[in-house]
Amino acid sequence: MADVLDLHEAGGEDFAMDEDGDESIHKLKEKAKKRKGRGFGADEGTRTRIREDYDSVEQDGDEPGPQRSVEGWILFVTGVHEEATEEDIHDKFGEFGEIKNIHLNLDRRTGFLKGYALVEYETYKEALAAMEGLNGQDLMGQPVSVDWGFVRGPPKGKRRSGRRRSRSPERRRR
């Protein structure tokens, strides 16, 4: 069996509690602020400063609008012909400004295009001009639809309170 050391008998002075320690702990706890949650309720000045760091387009009314991605302004092009190439899309969209990036997804099984493309412009004006100029236009004999890749949702401040759906009827017990 292992030897058991009784702390109260041998060397009890090493483990003695400091009487003043309790008072200092209470003083520290009184000065500390009690905080809950994430971010600890940062002041409004910090939030507005953070919002100013990002590019955005002024929003008219309550409609959702375009939002800039980290890299640039991305357009989502649907209805692209399955045999279209990156050069075909670059030729068509390059008329409206310098294209930063084009992304085409291919179907692994067939090797053809999946029917959509992502076209990225550096500036909002170029992306808007391309969207307005090419939405509904033909690309390789098929009409394409052009819209923003990222959009802002509706404003958060105008939510109505309460339930959004009606409740299901109570189950009958037999």
Curated annotation (Swiss-Prot):
Transit peptide in keyword set: no
Keywords, comma-separated and alphabetical: Cytoplasm, mRNA processing, mRNA splicing, mRNA transport, Nonsense-mediated mRNA decay, Nucleus, RNA-binding, Spliceosome, Translation regulation, Transport
GO molecular function, one term: mRNA binding
Gene Ontology biological process terms, A to Z: mRNA splicing, via spliceosome; mRNA transport; nuclear-transcribed mRNA catabolic process, nonsense-mediated decay; regulation of alternative mRNA splicing, via spliceosome; regulation of translation; RNA splicing
Cited Pfam families: RRM_1 (PF00076)
Subcellular localization: Nucleus; Nucleus speckle; Cytoplasm
Main localization, broad class: nucleus
Residue ranges, compositional bias (Basic and acidic residues): 1-11, 44-54
GO cellular component: cytoplasm; exon-exon junction complex; nuclear speck; nucleus; U2-type catalytic step 1 spliceosome
Extent of the signal sequence: none
SUPFAM superfamilies per the UniProt record, alphabetical: RNA-binding domain, RBD
Disulfide bonds: none
Protein family per UniProt: Belongs to the RBM8A family.
Protein name, UniProt field: RNA-binding protein 8A-B
Species the sequence originates in: Xenopus laevis
Taxonomic lineage of the native organism: Eukaryota, Metazoa, Chordata, Craniata, Vertebrata
Gene that encodes the chain: rbm8a-b
